[in-house]
């Protein structure tokens, strides 16, 4: 079956309604039922609870509380590197931005302008720069951390579709990451500006950042923007910056001649938060 045919049902199902329902169920505190669901999830996806700060499944009051569980101290030691991997998961794609085109999968690419919600001036900063698309599976730790020190300057919420995000949809849905709902976080660093984009998906109930809290819902259907130039919000390398309540994908953009990727990286490779993502290219 072709990838386009495989994703055809996703054009037909009520993705928004399913996502709203999933968000409500995931936040519900249903006692023993919640514990049973979490226990099933841990078995189904082989979740390693020994890494969790709290490994006691029965102590989680809601599925969201379990899903966004913190790790115990020392579970992800930080590499001695200029840029750290911000998440647990797998590498979808990474490499050089071709003028303004980001490679998604064979036969598919999308523009940096589309990714950041149409802001051409912002997108131009990453012309011929570097990108990394990192996928978080259901079993993974779902908090996102800083790849390097950064000062927050902007956050942009872009409404969009809610296709599921996986290798099949990456191959079968053109412009997937620039079509789905997303939150774009813009930082300044000693290496220049960089972008961390949190991409939503079917049943991703919401996305949150440490400085704002929950961003969605609500889902107003229009682009929203927050500016932080005067608030001096600074986050250290390795510090938590956000989380998925049910998870998806992170897309990062860096300027030209900034990032030299870890030579051990390759598409589909498993990654862990805190490992070396790359070094300063200058």
Curated annotation (Swiss-Prot):
It is a peripheral membrane protein. The keyword Iron-sulfur does not apply. Pathway: Phospholipid metabolism; phosphatidylethanolamine biosynthesis; phosphatidylethanolamine from CDP-diacylglycerol: step 2/2. GO terms for molecular function: phosphatidylserine decarboxylase activity. Its main location: membrane. It is found in: Cell membrane. InterPro entries: PS_Dcarbxylase, PSD-B, PSD_type1_pro. The record marks 247-248 as: Cleavage (non-hydrolytic). Heterodimer of a large membrane-associated beta subunit and a small pyruvoyl-containing alpha subunit. Belongs to the phosphatidylserine decarboxylase family. PSD-B subfamily. Prokaryotic type I sub-subfamily. Catalyzes the formation of phosphatidylethanolamine (PtdEtn) from phosphatidylserine (PtdSer). This is Phosphatidylserine decarboxylase proenzyme. It comes from Dechloromonas aromatica (strain RCB). The lineage of its organism: Bacteria, Pseudomonadati, Pseudomonadota, Betaproteobacteria, Rhodocyclales.
